Amino acid sequence: MRLSRYFLPILKENPKEAEIVSHRLMLRSGMIRQQSAGIYSWLPIGLKVLNKVCTIIREEQNRAGANEILMPTIQSADLWRESGRYDAYGKEMLRIQDRQEREMLFGPTNEEMVTDIFRSYVRSYKDLPLNLYHIQWKFRDEVRPRFGVMRSREFLMKDAYSFDLDYEGAKMAYYRMFVSYLRTFARVGLQAIPMRADTGPIGGDLSHEFIILAETGESQVYCDRAYLDLAVPGADTDFRNDAQLTDIVTRWTTPYAATDEMHDEADWAKVKPESQVSARGIEVGHIFHFGTKYSEPMGAKVQGPDGKEHLVSMGSYGIGPSRLVAAAIEASHDDAGIIWPKAIAPFGAGIVNMKPGDEGCDGVSEKLYEALTNAGVDPLLDDKDERPGAKFATMDLIGLPTQVIVGPRGVAAGEVEVKDRKMGERQSLGIEAAINMLTAQA
């Protein structure tokens, strides 16, 4: 993409309404625009990042055996009355009527609808286990939306729902999602720590929040430093191997880790002082086993191997892709702007033509652009006639992993300057060497 043809509305000043780093940088870098309280438009560069996050989520959900569907945002109030949640749910749920005065709602979550889909088609234990997921925009009328897309009223959510014959099957479904989440966050470029979470009235031990450590986190968290050294499950993980999954979950839940709500001082005291990490954290995912909470009132049953009907045991698993984008910025930025992990960077590299109109600079910039595009690097070519300082500031702000600087002096020497955004290191390379280095990283 050429910057002269790209819609990138950069803000030079920090927006007054932005309270945290991610909100400020997303507005300044032209990723989003606020349309009303807690509701945002995603602009081209922001949407590219969001789509890359969703691609990784999809790949890992599919790898774990989940099936993607897409449910409507508008739901019937009747389904929610079946589960008993329609009257119990607070003002966060937006309730509407259609022209026939039928009561509808803008879905804040999808347990009822996915249970209705399941009970309409699945009759036998032979069709289990089953996991259905979708990625969908949701709306919750937050009393005080703040922090940009971190706590917005409209947000993108990946929610998955598992169906199993009994608790043992549901536990393994939970383990599959647990491991899938570890891989998802690692691929996005984040170090997420699973922490014990409140299970509510259902009880049990199957509820975890996935937390990344960040100074601007909303909650206080406590964990053993051992988590920082744990190896994330590899791409060769066999999601059909219950023993392997159990071993991974055991390793990732044995060291102490808890949010402030679940913090236990007695257990915390057992962690060596030098291994204690007390910090702020951001929730980026939540998985939860809720048994027959929805299958019982909604009659979601299957015939078991004993010939009898059994209520299915269910779980839900959520990741907010839009929130995850903001969390990645909170975890990786500096005073100049965003530092994107390579996997979700909007472009693979930025080419900075220091002197558009100069035959040499234009020629080298075009050669780099064509070579990197053909190699799948997806570069952004800054071909605009602006001051060098403004060009550098824009590239640092939008956080592309690598910048290739093309100037008259370097071109005369047959070289370009390559800058690593994260490390700040610069090196002069021959043009072919620069192309080879960047294509090798693609």
Swiss-Prot record:
GO terms for molecular function: ATP binding; proline-tRNA ligase activity. Its EC number is 6.1.1.15. The keyword Cell membrane does not apply. Keywords: Aminoacyl-tRNA synthetase, ATP-binding, Cytoplasm, Ligase, Nucleotide-binding, Protein biosynthesis. It comes from the Bacteria. Gene3D superfamilies: Anticodon-binding domain (3.40.50.800), Bira Bifunctional Protein, Domain 2 (3.30.930.10). It holds the Pfam family tRNA-synt_2b. It is found in: Cytoplasm. GO terms for cellular component: cytosol. PROSITE patterns: AA_TRNA_LIGASE_II (PS50862). Its main location: cytoplasm. GO terms for biological process: prolyl-tRNA aminoacylation. It catalyses: tRNA(Pro) + L-proline + ATP = L-prolyl-tRNA(Pro) + AMP + diphosphate. Belongs to the class-II aminoacyl-tRNA synthetase family. ProS type 2 subfamily. PANTHER family: MITOCHONDRIAL RIBOSOME PROTEIN L39/PROLYL-TRNA LIGASE FAMILY MEMBER, PROLINE--TRNA LIGASE. This is Proline--tRNA ligase. It comes from Brucella canis (strain ATCC 23365 / NCTC 10854 / RM-666). The gene is proS.
